[in-house]
Amino acid sequence: MSARPDQSRTAAPSATTSPVEIYCDGACSGNPGPGGYGAILRYNGHEKEIRGSEAHTTNNRMELTAAMEALRLLTRPCRITIVTDSQYLVKGMTEWIQGWQRRGWQNSKKEPVLNRDLWEELLKLSAHHDVSWQWIRGHAGHAENERCDSLARQAITEMRGAP
């Protein structure tokens, strides 16, 4: 594994608006268990933070959900860079998904693809945009990634009703 961030693009229509930066992260307390996600969207000097949770989920589902919920907030086609510490998300969208689709949503071991519902939704949401997927190392001092992790954990705490 390289310490250099991976940068990959998914094919999408050309976008005509200013670039959007999305930082996202998912977290789980137990895996599976209660989970949360957090995301930061930046556009034209504006910033929006979002977070959410599910009572019983996995870390990977929260990673995918973070990206999905951020994409849902965009109202027109955009150039987007999505930055995440999830290789599962980046490789899924840039390397694996075409093969899964060709094989009828089976992985290379001929098993059903996990989280297919979320992958299909991510494909649908990203199809309207020009998306670049960037991996960064988690818990390595990247301010936005740390903030997204904090938002995800805060969402879990709020769901549990803790102060």
UniProtKB/Swiss-Prot annotation:
Pfam families, A to Z: RNase_H (PF00075)
Residues annotated to bind Mg(2+) 1: 25, 63, 85
Residues involved in Mg(2+) 2 binding: 25, 149
SUPFAM superfamilies per the UniProt record, alphabetical: Ribonuclease H-like
Keywords: Cytoplasm, Endonuclease, Hydrolase, Magnesium, Metal-binding, Nuclease
Cited Gene3D superfamilies: Ribonuclease H-like superfamily/Ribonuclease H (3.30.420.10)
One GO-annotated biological process of the protein: DNA replication, removal of RNA primer
Subcellular location: Cytoplasm
GO terms for cellular component: cytoplasm
UniProt catalytic activity: Endonucleolytic cleavage to 5'-phosphomonoester
RNase H type-1 domain boundaries: 16-157
EC number(s) given by UniProt: 3.1.26.4
Top-rank taxon, per record: Bacteria
Chief location: cytoplasm
GO molecular function (one): magnesium ion binding
Textual note on the cofactor: Binds 1 Mg(2+) ion per subunit. May bind a second metal ion at a regulatory site, or after substrate binding.
NCBIfam families reported in the protein's UniProt record: PRK00203.1
Function: Endonuclease that specifically degrades the RNA of RNA-DNA hybrids.
Family: Belongs to the RNase H family.
Protein name: Ribonuclease H
Organism: Pelobacter propionicus (strain DSM 2379 / NBRC 103807 / OttBd1)
